[in-house]
Amino acid sequence: MRHKISRVLTVMLPLLLVIFVLVLTGLPRNGNQASKLQFGISFPEKINQEALDGRMLLMISTDGTREPRYQISDGPDTQLIFGIDVDGLKPDDMAIIDSTVFGYPLKSIAEIPPGDYWVQALLHIYETFHRSDGHVVKLPMDRGEGQRWNRAPGNLYSTPKKVHVDPSKDGIIRITLDKKNPPIPPPRDTKYIKHVKIQSKLLTEFWGRPMHIGACVLLPEGFDEHPEARYPLVINHGHFPYTFSGFRETPPDPDLKPTYSSRFGIHGYNRIVQEHDYKFYKDWTGPDFPRVVIIKVQHANPFYDDSYAVNSENLGPYGDAITYELIPYVEKKFRCLGEGWARFLYGGSTGGWEALGVQVMYPDEYNGCYAACPDPIDFRAYTIVNIYEHENAYYLKSHFKRTPRPGHRNYLGEISSTLEDMNHRELVLGTKSRSGAQWDIWQAVYSPVGEDGYPKPIWDKMTGKIDHSVAEYWRENYDLSYILQRDWETLGPKLKGKIHIYCGDMDNYYLNNAVYLIEEFLESTNNPYYDGEVDYGDRAEHCWNGDHCQPNAISRLRYHQMFIPRIVERIEKTAPPGADLTSWRYKK
């Protein structure tokens, strides 16, 4: 018997060893490894008496100089964040974050090295919308902050505290949301800057509750002294404007403490910004600057700090609301000419896409766009992803290796984050395109509505696998390069001379790739030739705007001085017979 057992063991031992090794290699790792540590997060009744829906976020940081909620980024200096959805969370009930909860950049609290950390929690509150398309969705309505989860009014958060974290130890770390973000006061009007807001009939009908859009308006010198004047309107598109920034009516603060700009590598860049803001005020009010009205549109919404200024299945008819409700209101209130030949668009990055996108979608309503470093305008180069041909957004196709696609670089090509990093950060901040961040808003604007009422994903947010059926919808509706090529026979005559695009050839987000592709088409056009401009900045990063004479850190502060004189030149060339070219051309 003993001999038989010995023979069996001799035969079975190699097989058992193989099975043992396979079991070990198949054990869950990193984000899936077991840990009994938990974080229990709650809020007291004195802070909020009602049950709340939203996204519960836990931030863990090694840096005690700032609150952890302000330390989450795509770059290598980011701290840790974990998130879960909560529905109907009542006062004193605990939301639990354990090792099964997905995090960024570490995938689980089980991966956190033992040590002392600063911890903070925050509840990003959702509102329930009963939309006109029949869907009921829960989203974070903007509350005047421009979709900033870490400072949105009404959000609950905890006082940061230092705790010892050891995932190998059983226990629960309790966190109380003892504070609430205060309301944001309305901006102050001045002689030159005015703020307007209207309730949009179109958006109110779509969202099933009152929805507003607004504008920060910069009035020309002499506006009150020349009541007979009627002005061209310039729309400076871009991210959410609290007020009309870049315009300073007083000299730079002599007591301003200089700060360092890591983006530009400049000490005292805040002082430079104030100097150029004041310089614009001096130019604007001087005798020779063209007299026009400039607006920055306020169209923050439940998905992002702006809407991309076009109609969308998920966001609603923001394009029509801005073009046919807000702009006529502004033009009437501030004595603008009120015709397409006297309206112009410019902006950078998001504003660059909006400038070109609005010009393409509403070709007769505007007389020219100046699009700097636009977000992807050809989805064959959705940054560096070809959504029509690539299988995965995060990794290059390979049988034997995983090469990640980069997401952010500097002008030397040094990588600070990957596309997977960026998207996983957003996934922690919010599921179903609710992060309020860049990739999610592109998806919200461009995608059809999914069966659950939320944007249908262009790719799996966790794995990067692309859904090519969604990509086809994007192509037909929002790929600006494709739309121009498809419809040039009808669009071409309306857009001749109106398209101007600028981009650095080392744009941090690879936005120049799409510009190369659209340029190939534009330069091939005839009947008519597009007769515009596409230009590149050598070694220029995001967001180069066509200025070859000054560094990017300076030229980005001079959009108005760069483009408004060119707008006036185009008005002089293209205004229809009998157009008013004189009432607004006064000196003082």
Question: Which ranges hold each PLM region?
Answer:
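Sec-dependent signal peptide recognition
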Residues: 7-18, 137-147
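Bacterial Sec-dependent signal peptides at the C-terminal "C-region" and cleavage site
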Residues: 8-36
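N-terminal processing/targeting junctions
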Residues: 20, 38, 224-226
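Contiguous beta-strand segments within globular domains
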Residues: 34-43, 49-57, 212-216, 235
